[in-house]
């Protein structure tokens, strides 16, 4: 519908290191009301710009700077609670786990995500946010019935995948799934 206003949010990222190659390395949706964030970049206004662009009838309506990406999303009706990559306490843990794709989750459905087991502080933050932590090997061997859990994180073992330059979302081909109603 051409009458509908299109909203484009642009999040500036650092040019280096390569762990900031795209948005999924610092921000991913986990559920309808939760997202994984790399706090030093996503939650710190001023360091990197967030821009909100509005387009209608193929024409630019406005461009404005927003305080943060989460602030801009909230204005659009997506009030998201952040879960912090690397936990909330130590910047070193945040940096280390972001470098190891700790903010990069593959969301199969709202509240059902896959991510790396090696990011211990991130896994703990997910558990504290209400996600059941389930090992991928337990799913593969049918030791776990996923239908019994409302929210879960399936943890993927290994250190070789992050060396390939991405996380669970980066390394997943597109899938067909039902649209999420916000």
Which residues fall in each region the model found?
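The feature marks the mature, well-folded catalytic cores of soluble enzymes
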Residues: 1-182
């Amino acid at each position: 519908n051409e009458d509908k206003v299109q909203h484009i949010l642009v999040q500036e990222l650092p040019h280096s290191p390569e762990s900031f190659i795209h948005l999924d390395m610092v921000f991913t949706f986990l559920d309808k009301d939760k997202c994984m964030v790399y706090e030093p970049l996503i939650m710190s206004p001023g360091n990197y710009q967030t821009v909100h662009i509005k387009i209608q009838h193929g024409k630019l309506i406005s461009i404005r700077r927003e305080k943060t990406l989460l602030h801009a999303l909230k204005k659009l009706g997506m009030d998201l609670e952040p879960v912090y990559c690397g936990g909330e306490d130590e910047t070193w843990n945040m940096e280390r786990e972001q470098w190891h794709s700790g903010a990069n989750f593959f969301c199969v459905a709202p509240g059902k995500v896959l991510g790396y087991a090696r990011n211990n502080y991130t896994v703990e933050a997910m558990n504290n946010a209400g996600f059941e932590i389930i090992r991928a090997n337990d799913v593969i061997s049918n030791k776990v019935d996923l239908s019994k859990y409302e929210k879960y994180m399936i943890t993927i073992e290994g250190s070789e995948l992050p060396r390939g330059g991405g996380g669970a979302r980066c390394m997943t081909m597109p899938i067909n799934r039902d649209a999420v109603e916000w």
